[in-house]
Curated annotation (Swiss-Prot):
Entry-linked InterPro entries: Aminotrans_II_pyridoxalP_BS (IPR001917), Aminotransferase_I/II_large (IPR004839), AON_synthase_class-II (IPR050087), AONS_Archaea/Firmicutes (IPR010962), AONS_Archaea/Proteobacteria (IPR004723), PyrdxlP-dep_Trfase (IPR015424), PyrdxlP-dep_Trfase_major (IPR015421), PyrdxlP-dep_Trfase_small (IPR015422)
Sites bearing N6-(pyridoxal phosphate)lysine, chain numbering: K238
GO biological process: biotin biosynthetic process
Binding site for substrate: R20, H132, T352
Keywords, comma-separated and alphabetical: Acyltransferase, Biotin biosynthesis, Pyridoxal phosphate, Transferase
Subunit structure: Homodimer.
Associated pathway: Cofactor biosynthesis; biotin biosynthesis
Enzyme Commission designation: 2.3.1.47
Listed Gene3D superfamilies: Aspartate Aminotransferase, domain 1, Type I PLP-dependent aspartate aminotransferase-like (Major domain)
Name of the protein in question: 8-amino-7-oxononanoate synthase
Transmembrane segments: none
UniProt GO MF annotations: 8-amino-7-oxononanoate synthase activity; glycine C-acetyltransferase activity; pyridoxal phosphate binding
Protein species of origin: Exiguobacterium sibiricum (strain DSM 17290 / CCUG 55495 / CIP 109462 / JCM 13490 / 255-15)
Length: 390
């Protein structure tokens, strides 16, 4: 009927070995999952703390659905705000040590809504070269001038700040934890430079919320920078285990986004089950602190094992550990063979990462046992030798 040129591109992907099928899980998201009837060790989810199937969250979601229904039937600004939506935002602001918080339908929608609403033609956005795709797309939607600085290059960032001093507002945007490499942004130095040149900072804590800081408060709290970062955005779907995105900010910024943030304005609000599960997740993170201990113990054990085997895992200092292969087809071979050995670890290639930087990105969680990780390392050893990667 149309778009026939897409068939050619898809066929080229198949010939290059980079075409991927969606993989359907047949079980809940745990340390082990079922795919095609086979139990696999899960190393590809963002379920850092194991909250996605935590019984407390599941029960709270079920109870909320029974009491308040399956959906809300409206956007927040018309008839879709329940008291629980407002209560959760108050709790989230308290958790993040900010004046206010606003919840969006997803982390991606948060970045689109925040950046497109807050920046105009008189402003400049200064963004790290390896920021998440949602930041890139959010910047594209603004009318602001833009400057991309080299990845975590403070000298290049300072040059960008020096070159843009005539702007009304300058916003420095960085991931807190970079999702493909697992490295942490040098946030103290970024904040110092921003303050030196009278600029603001926005941190995307998608992979830091629930991982860094006290009880998972994120990168800002991790570095003791509470009160010095204008915008903290993040997801509620990774370590927090449910769905949604948020911005933690000052009250007047929240008020403005309620009126001008298009993804917020034109999307139906979260169902009661989602809201209440998110609220319960914050309580679990405050109360079950042993989850963080297990997460970091597992992280160090697995990283050490991969290094000992001789894999290139980059400079990650977080639970994200990339096994960098380079060649896209070889990366997917590694992923496929790992599955044959009982490990679910997906290959990631262009356009998610740059060409020639393909990798199998692994993420350990608080749910993994030592047996899980030892078995996974043995699989990496066998497959790595088969493919002559080690």
């Amino acid at each position: 009927m149309g778009f026939e040129h897409l068939r050619t591109e898809l066929e080229e992907m198949k010939q290059a070995g980079t075409f991927r099928e969606l993989v359907a899980l047949e079980s809940a998201q745990h340390n082990r999952v079922t795919v095609d009837g086979k139990e696999l060790i899960q190393l590809s989810s963002n379920n850092y703390l194991g909250l996605a199937a935590h019984p407390r969250l599941a029960k709270r979601a079920a109870d909320a659905a029974l009491e308040f229904g399956a959906g809300t039937g409206s956007v927040r600004t018309i008839a879709g705000t329940l008291e629980m939506h407002q209560a959760f935002e108050r709790e989230l602001a308290t958790f993040k040590h900010t004046e206010a918080a606003l919840v969006f339908q997803s982390g991606f929608a948060t970045n689109l809504g925040v950046l497109s609403a807050l920046l105009g033609p008189e402003d400049v956005v200064i963004s790290d070269a390896l920021n998440h795709a949602s930041i890139i797309d959010g910047i594209r939607l603004t009318k602001a001038k833009r400057r991309i600085y080299n990845h975590v290059d403070l000298a290049d960032l300072e040059a960008a700040l020096q070159e843009t001093q005539d702007a009304r507002t300058r916003l420095v945007v960085t991931d807190g934890v970079f999702s493909m490499d697992g490295n942490i942004a040098p946030l103290p130095e970024i904040v110092e430079l921003a303050e030196k040149y009278d600029a603001l900072v926005m941190v995307d804590d998608a992979h830091a919320s629930g991982v860094l800081g006290k009880s998972g408060r994120g990168t800002v709290n991790h570095f003791g920078l509470d009160g010095r970062v204008a915008l903290q955005v993040g997801t509620l779907s990774k370590a927090i285990g449910v769905l949604g995105g948020y911005v933690a900010c000052e009250q007047h910024v929240k008020d403005y986004l309620i009126h001008k943030g298009r993804p917020f304005l034109f999307s139906t609000s979260h169902p009661p089950a989602v809201v209440e599960a998110n609220r319960e997740a914050l309580r679990v993170m405050e109360e079950e602190t042993e989850l963080f201990d297990r997460l970091w113990e597992n992280t160090e054990f697995f990283k050490h094992g991969l290094r000992e085997l001789g894999f290139n895992i980059g400079t990650s200092t977080t639970p994200i550990t990339p096994v960098i292969v380079g060649d896209e087809a070889l990366c997917h071979q590694l992923s496929d063979r790992l599955r044959q050995h009982g490990v679910f670890a997906q290959g990631i290639a262009f356009p998610t990462v740059a060409k020639g930087k393909a990798r199998v990105r692994t993420i350990v969680t608080a749910e993994h046992t030592r047996e899980d990780l030892e078995q996974a390392l043995e699989a990496f050893k066998q497959v790595g030798q088969e493919l002559e990667l080690i």
